Curated annotation (Swiss-Prot):
PANTHER family: S-RIBOSYLHOMOCYSTEINE LYASE. Gene3D superfamilies: S-ribosylhomocysteinase (LuxS) (3.30.1360.80). It catalyses: S-(5-deoxy-D-ribos-5-yl)-L-homocysteine = (S)-4,5-dihydroxypentane-2,3-dione + L-homocysteine. Involved in the synthesis of autoinducer 2 (AI-2) which is secreted by bacteria and is used to communicate both the cell density and the metabolic potential of the environment. The regulation of gene expression in response to changes in cell density is called quorum sensing. Catalyzes the transformation of S-ribosylhomocysteine (RHC) to homocysteine (HC) and 4,5-dihydroxy-2,3-pentadione (DPD). Its EC number is 4.4.1.21. GO terms for biological process: quorum sensing. Keywords: Autoinducer synthesis, Iron, Lyase, Metal-binding, Quorum sensing. The keyword Iron applies. This is S-ribosylhomocysteine lyase. GO terms for molecular function: iron ion binding; S-ribosylhomocysteine lyase activity. InterPro entries: LuxS_sf, Metalloenz_LuxS/M16, S-ribosylhomocysteinase. The gene is luxS. Its cofactor is Fe cation.
Length: 152
């Protein structure tokens, strides 16, 4: 059976919120990194789908304004955070700083991008109010640079 990195992570010992380099892949000169942007404590809480979906849209646009080389930002199936796939090498500090900036933008935003039936496959399932509330929760707790101990 194939090994899946996220299934090997001990979800009982991590301490969210945090940013974690979850994997790298090298092919010739091309380097791809996968980051775990964990917002909520696994097996304790989960983002409601409206908040998760809205945060996905806001992160998709605003993180690309902060960082170069983003390939994709996708919600985790467990609804506790997001995976971000990027070209080239970055530091967790760089990712955290960008995420803090973006979550502050989320708190102050009034418009969710790409919420029409043409642009979004589930355009009715959004909650800007909830996205803002969860952004505040994450910022209030602080985003750690380590998944197992709080390094703020």
């Amino acid at each position: 059976m194939a090994r899946v990195e996220s299934f090997e992570l001990d979800h009982n010992t991590v301490k969210a919120p945090y940013v974690r380099l979850a994997g790298t892949e090298q092919n010739g000169d091309a380097l791809v990194e996968k980051y775990d942007l964990r917002f909520l404590q696994p097996n304790k809480d989960a983002l409601p789908t409206g908040a998760l979906h809205t945060l996905e849209h806001l992160l998709a646009v605003n993180m690309r304004d902060e960082l170069k080389g983003i390939i994709d930002i996708s919600p985790m199936g467990c609804r506790t955070g997001f995976y971000m796939i990027m070209w080239d090498q970055h530091s967790p500090q760089e990712i955290r700083d960008a995420l803090v900036n973006v979550l502050n933008k989320v708190i102050n935003t009034e418009v969710v991008p790409a919420v029409s039936a043409k642009e979004c496959g589930n355009y009715k399932d959004h909650s800007l109010f909830a996205a803002k509330e969860y952004a505040k929760i994450v910022l209030d707790q602080g985003i750690s640079l380590d998944p197992f101990e709080r390094i703020l």
